[in-house]
Amino acid sequence: IQPFLFRFHDMQFGLAHNGNLTNATSLKKELEERGAIFSATSDSEILAHLIRRSHNPSLMGKIKEALSLVKGGFAYILLFEDKLIAALDPNGFRPLSIGKMANGAVVVSSETCAFEVIGAEWIRDLKPGEIVIIDDKGIQYDSYTDDTQLAICSMEYIYFARPDSNIHGVNVHTARKRMGAQLAREFKHEADIVVGVPNSSLS
């Protein structure tokens, strides 16, 4: 159950992960050969072990190195004692947004609809390959790669996201209506009934 909590002898942190790593099998095998012990089958643990085993002297250096090694679509949130760090994959496959509460607290979510529930104001979406660091100094933006493109997974609009969320400026419900209209234009068949893919894609 996320978030995962990691307690190493020299660091501890929490980790939440949305996505899938395409090189999870090879990374896990390599880490296990180097002595890493995994407590579950989830690929979410891989980033934590890569951070811990990095020889980079700085925490941000360790995180950037680890992020450059994992491949696939992912959004990570890491919680340390004095900061929260969020990161997005180089293609922006998964959405990740920054918001702010009325009291100044900064929040991060994979869906903008969560901000409305807690009374937060949307600030902006993370860009592909971007890292955001949130601490007592405020919000700082950084990146771990320049090899990026925005290629959001179409399933976010079709199925994963709630209809009242916005992804990179596009409302999910509106996107679904437009896709349905385009589908009707391309496939001119008389249908008895048209239904969405339950449950989360119904809007």
Where is each model-derived feature located?
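Conserved short alpha-helical segments that host acidic/polar catalytic motifs at enzyme active sites
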Residues: 1-128, 133-198
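Carboxylate/His-rich catalytic cores and anion/metal-binding grooves
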Residues: 202-203
